[in-house]
Amino acid sequence: FLKTVAKKTKLITQDSDAPGSNRLCYVGMDNYEAGRMCGQLVKKALPDGGSVIIFVGRLGQDNAKHRRQGVIDELLDRGNDPKRYDKPGQVLRGDKYEILDTRTDDFDFAKAKSLAQDSIVKYPKLSCMVGLFAYNPPILLEALKSAGKLKTIKVIGFDEEDGTLKGIQDGDVAGTIVQNPYKYGYESVRILHALAKGDNRVLPKDGFLNIPARSITSANVDAFWAELKMLTGK
């Protein structure tokens, strides 16, 4: 479908790339690098090591696949290789950390909560839960609260849901990796506006306009949330 679109008009992608679509460029973050940043938050929360489960909507899209692999490679102290892919369904062990499972919920919030609850029961020594999509961390917090495991099992997240940021303020979430969707939108419109005028100079040379991810913890969550409210007018 996207290849057909690309033949008929100016096509760019943002947030999640589709490199095989003949799009002119991708605007967003490096999801593999963001995954490694997420893994670094796990290491900071569990300096002595521990067991981890990753939660995500699905792995069929590049952003999810690359985030997950970045987390895994960071925890296993591997070198950078965005093309590497560890298939789910196997336990991955390093010197200090082990990834017990990757659980996919197909964007079903009830299923996401059920998977979190099941993980808490199935793995009584579970150390950390990592949520790769925006809705995952708040749902993980709900499951942990019901199980009386808040602060016992560490939570690391992605994106800037209010529940996630409040969790960081309350000490229930160790940290989250955030994107800059405001900048994504701004740069995408800027590029499309120039392309519509026939100006291709606006395109990045390698086809990727990198808008870096940021790591949010208790040290900077208040300032970040204030900035976010200003940008969104909330």
Feature map (PLM): residue ranges:
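Hydrophobic alpha-helical
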Residues: F1-V5, L11, V71, E98-K166
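Solvent-exposed loop/turn segments at secondary-structure junctions
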Residues: D17-G20, Y32, R58-D62, D105-F109, ...
